[in-house]
Amino acid sequence: MTIDAVVFDVDGVLVDTDASYTESVIRTVRWLAPDAPIDRALIRLWRRSGDWNNDWDLCYGLYCWLNAPTKLDPAVAARKTLAELEAAASGLGFGYREVQGIFEEHDNGTAVAVARYGVTRRIDNERPLALDERVMLQPGLLVELAAMGISKLGVVTGRVRSDWDQIAGRIPLPAGVPVSTDEDGRKPDPAPLRRVVEALAPAGVAVVGDTLNDLRMTQAFFRAGTLHAICVIRCDVDESELYLQAGAAATIRSLGELPAALRAVIG
């Protein structure tokens, strides 16, 4: 097996977004439903169980689930589609775009949310949670990958372009790295991955992600083409076996473990 390219997800892989995106999901859902049993464990459950790579979808899906007359077990609800959860909900006080706006006020701050998305001002947040994001990629990792013959790098993120642009300068990737954002297609659609891979023209690619949709995107890309593609998932220890059973080539706790994981897979 030849792997000479790595395509990174951003949130949860290159950037620690626990204090930004994840916290924004929690605050958004609690703003909508103050007594909601929302915590990080629940969010992790949903992200590894279904089509919840996009945090706008996740917020609205959780909101719909909480407003269903018949309460589904959270693990069961996580495997439903957004349309199914919305159809089962009743008495929703806010629609998708309104929930998106509340999330953006928390994450990017009210001023940016209003200017960028035209949302209605509701929470007056002057300090964006996005300020608390921490870059996890270290330059030494890229040196180690290059020593293994892996020098082609790309990015496929669920972020919109404006959110990518505001963090990109802090991530130590080479200039000119091909990037696909939400505007290029949503995971698990393989189109954004295909766009990046075509720019890299590799012999084989490893996708590094942190959600079920990253894995599904990679699998869909591999099934549709002739290029070998594997997915390595960054996750906690208690999630590892679930991702391996779903088809991940390997799981890692941190980016620092990536070279060893790839060596074990490539042989």
Please report, for each region that a protein language model flagged, where it lies by residue.
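Substrate-recognition "cap/lid" segment bordering the active-site pocket of phosphatases
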Residues: 125, 129-134, 154-206, 212-224
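Non-catalytic pre-domain segments flanking phosphatase-related domains
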Residues: 1-8, 30, 68-109, 260-267
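Short, acidic loop-to-helix structural element flanking the phosphoryl-transfer center
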Residues: 7, 101-155, 159-168, 190
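Structural recognition of alpha->loop->beta junctions
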Residues: 172-182, 239-263
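Active-site neighborhood of HAD-like aspartate-dependent phosphohydrolases
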Residues: 1-45, 51, 57-60, 64
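Acidic, Mg2+-coordinating phosphoryl-transfer loop and its flanking beta/alpha structural elements
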Residues: 207-253
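Glycine-rich phosphate-binding loop signature in dinucleotide/nucleotide-binding domains
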Residues: 148-151, 199-203, 265-266
